Structure formats: structure tokens, C-alpha cells
Amino acid sequence: MKTWLMGFSEFLLRYKLVWSETWKIRKQLDTPVREKDENEFLPAHLELIETPVSRRPRLVAYFIMGFLVIAFILSVLGQVEIVATANGKLTHSGRSKEIKPIENSIVKEIIVKEGESVRKGDVLLKLTALGAEADTLKTQSSLLQARLEQTRYQILSRSIELNKLPELKLPDEPYFQNVSEEEVLRLTSLIKEQFSTWQNQKYQKELNLDKKRAERLTVLARINRYENLSRVEKSRLDDFSSLLHKQAIAKHAVLEQENKYVEAVNELRVYKSQLEQIESEILSAKEEYQLVTQLFKNEILDKLRQTTDNIGLLTLELAKNEERQQASVIRAPVSVKVQQLKVHTEGGVVTTAETLMVIVPEDDTLEVTALVQNKDIGFINVGQNAIIKVEAFPYTRYGYLVGKVKNINLDAIEDQRLGLVFNVIISIEENCLSTGNKNIPLSSGMAVTAEIKTGMRSVISYLLSPLEESVTESLRER
């Protein structure tokens, strides 16, 4: 190893010595300087050797090298935009609404036309819900009858308290304004009939009570009579017993008197028993008399409660039917413009949830609904700038729109042509394109191409990325 190093050192010293000697005589080795015309008289091979080289190729080489250096510096320092391209269309913002019927209906009248502007509250379309008008009239009639029944029971309830039939007077309410005279007469007749029936029942119970009271008086009179008779017969029996003790009369007379006394006592017991029975019957008659009024009152109050409940249900049903009819008259919620009118025949039938038209507020804005491919969605964020090019108007002549990413839907959508794509909403600043002094309005449904700026990258990285990708993939191969 030491020998090898010594040899290498001597080799370097040798070459150093040769270079030094050559450097000392370098000027002697230069060709003598000659004029241009002197070179022309030299032999051809010497002329070619002695003639200086032209500076033009050298300048071109310097220029090319400088250009390459400048291009390299610009490629390192220069930045280009990274753009994700997505196809889409112009749509209205979320405030545009579809008008749909709530149920199967018949088109009664078409008020508006396609593209017409209407103000808030203006009628757009009149429909007739199947059976809604008939249901409303039926419910109104049933509700009026229920209120008349309620009035009838209220009058009968007051008649029980006053024990006389009050005068029929309908309350001063709007729903009683159209009640016919025949209906009033029928109601009056029915009230009188019910009141008379109750009075007759009460009168019959009162007669029965009076009858029992009369029987009670008769029995009391007989009891009084036999009480007196029994005392007399008892006194006579005592007298006869005293005379028998003195042997003034026969024993047969005493036995006969005793028999009369026993008969009087037995009759007294019979009538007292009848009195107890009559007292019980009188008590029952009083209860029946009171029960007639109580039952009639309970019946009236129960009917009144049922009628009141029925009025509540019918009122809700009427409100529901009126709401159905009101929903059949479609009005503009705000000042809007009518678009996509799909109803053109009066008398035609529309079904539930069928789109009749689309209304767009006059101050509504357009936005872009674009489909972003799967490879680009990871680089798109809300707030990124975008350039919108409308296919109907070439951007080289009409320009383009400027917008920002408003919303990103991360649920993939299956597209037959593009595969899995993602829906991105881009808000735009203007609803028209400007060319010269003329504004071209845009409408929903126009096809557009959205170029979303996702970032910046250097030119050199852009140029080297295919090479880097190829090298990276090639190094992975077996």
C-alpha cells in the first residue's frame, strides 16, 4: 500500500513539473499574429488553421446558455395555478320554489303566463279540489244544525229552572243570519213538544202523588174512627166485666162485647198497616216526581254536552275544508317571476305533488351546480375562487363569470359517463355577461364549465412531475 502511494505521488510530481515547464514557454507556442490578407496567401491548410474562428457561433452559444439559465430561474421562481375543471349548469339559488297541489284537483283558471312577473299576494292559479266544495257545504249545514240544537237545549235547560217555556230567540250571531223561518218554526215546535212531554210526565206523577195523599187522609180518618171505637168497646167490655162479676148479666153478653172489641182492634191494626204502605207509596211518588225533572234535566244537559262537543269537531272539520279550498287558490308568497309553467289547459286534472310551475323571486341569484371528479374533490375547499365559462357564449368574445365555492356535497353521485362524482355549488357575482355596452342575461339550465383554482405550483415542478412519477413508479417494479 505504501509503495502504491509513493508511486502515485511521483506521478503527480511528474505531471506538475511538465505543466510548469509548459506554462513558462506558453507564449512561444502561440502562432504569430497575421493580418487577414496575409492569411489569404498562406497554403490552404495553413490558412484554415491560422484564420481566427468567427465570434457568431460563440455568441449564439452564449445566448442559448443565457436563455436556458433564465428559463431555469423563471421555472424555479415562477408559479402557475392549479385548476380543477368541472362541468355543470346554472341553477337558481335555494329560494326558487316548485308549486305543487296538496291533493288531486281540477284546473279552474290559469291566471299567469310563462315569464310573467307578479307581486306578493297575486293569484297564480285557481284549482278545485275534488269534493272540497261539497264537503264544506255539508259541514256548514251540519254545524248550523248543531248550533240550532245547542240553542234548543239551552232554552229547554232554562225552562226547567223557570218551570215555564221561554220565548225562542236566536242569538245575534253571523251564522244564524240565514236561518229560514221554516227552520225557526220547526225548532219552536220541537221545543214546545219536548217541554209539553216533560210537563205531562210531571203532571201524571203529581196526580199519582195527590191520589196517594188522598188515600192517606182516608186511612187516617178510618184509623181515628177505629181508635175511638176501640176505646168505646174497651170501656163497655170493662163495664160488662164488672156487671158479670156482680152477676148482673150473663157471661154470654160479656163474650159478645169482647168479640166486638177484638174486631175494632184488628181493624185498627189493618188500617195502620195500610197507612204505613201508603206513606211508603207517597215517598216513592215524591221521588218519582222529582226524578222526572232530574232525568229530563240530565238528558238535556247530556244532549247539550254532546252537541257542544260535536260543534267543536265540526268547527275543526269546517276549518280543514276551508283550508283545502284556500289551498286551491295558489298565490305568490313574494314578488316572483313565473318559470317552467307546466299547466296550460283549464279543466285539466293535476295530481298530488305534481310540479305546476317554478317561481323565482325577482331578486334571486344564479349559482353553478358542478360535478367534480373523484380525483379533484380532495383539493377543493369552500371559499376557493372559480372561473365560470358559459358554453352558449364563447369566453374569448363574451368573457366569463367569477365565483366562489359555496358548498361541497361529500356524498358521491354515480354518473354513467364520469363514474363517481361530487356535487359542488359555486356562487357567482353577476347574473349576466357583459360585452361592450350590452348585458346578456343568463338563465337557469345553461351548461357551463367551472375552473376552480385549487392552489399554486412552480413551473419546474410541473415540468418534472411526469418524470418524477415515472421514476417513482419504475423504482417499484420488480
From Swiss-Prot:
Keyword Cell membrane in the entry? The reply is yes
Q: How does it sit in the membrane?
A: Single-pass type II membrane protein
Compartments where found: Cell inner membrane
Q: What is its main location?
A: membrane
Positions in the Periplasmic compartment: 81-478
Membrane spanning stretches? 60-80
Instruction: Give the keywords, sorted.
Output: Cell inner membrane, Cell membrane, Cytolysis, Hemolysis, Membrane, Plasmid, Signal-anchor, Transmembrane, Transmembrane helix, Transport
Task: Report the GO terms under cellular component.
Answer: plasma membrane
Family affiliation: Belongs to the membrane fusion protein (MFP) (TC 8.A.1) family.
What's the stated role of this polypeptide?
Involved in the transport of hemolysin A.
By what name is this protein known? Hemolysin secretion protein D, plasmid
